Amino acid sequence: MTASILTALLLLAPITPETARFTIRQDGRTIGTEEFTIRSQGKGYVAEGKTQLVGDPTPLSCRMELDENLNPTSYEYTHGLGTIRIKIETPTSQMTVGGGGSESSTEFRFPSGASIIDNNFFHHYLLLLYRVKGADQKFPIFVPQDMQAGQARVRSTGTRTYDLEVGDVKLEATVDSAGRLTRLTVPAAKVVVER
């Protein structure tokens, strides 16, 4: 079965609701974990994640609501007292950033059709891979913690394997027969994320 046919078949299957845990390693040492849940809500989905990094007593948390096409409609990130909340609408979206008792809001144009790929939340790559419909695709992305838009390129490299380029970062992903992310590596940083 060719990679493009397998990719198409994976897309025809519904998103797999799941609760799972990734272990994050760098240079062979465990540097953190991420627990996440993806569940159906109405016609869309809710994805929630919590990442605990070694040396940081405060976990990072996020919650994303997505429509039936996996387009984000809202996003919330928290780390201690710091928060980022995004309400995605057309033509203008709203971002509210809080921390230390103060809060500021700004309107901005969320890139049309973009995926959210935030720092230290690896289940966001799983959601991106669920959107793949061909052997080589480009997707607009938005990184809330960096407040930057960019582009991700996803290329199928074989049965259930992908190369990803997110800005300057190159990653390799492996999914199982249900399309669930099982391993993500960032070779240049010697980072391996796996179930």
What do these predicted ranges mean?
Residues 16-26:
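A short, Trp-centered hydrophobic/proline-enriched beta-strand micro-motif
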Residues 17-18, 59-60, 167-169:
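Short, small/polar residue-rich loop motifs at catalytic or cofactor-binding pockets
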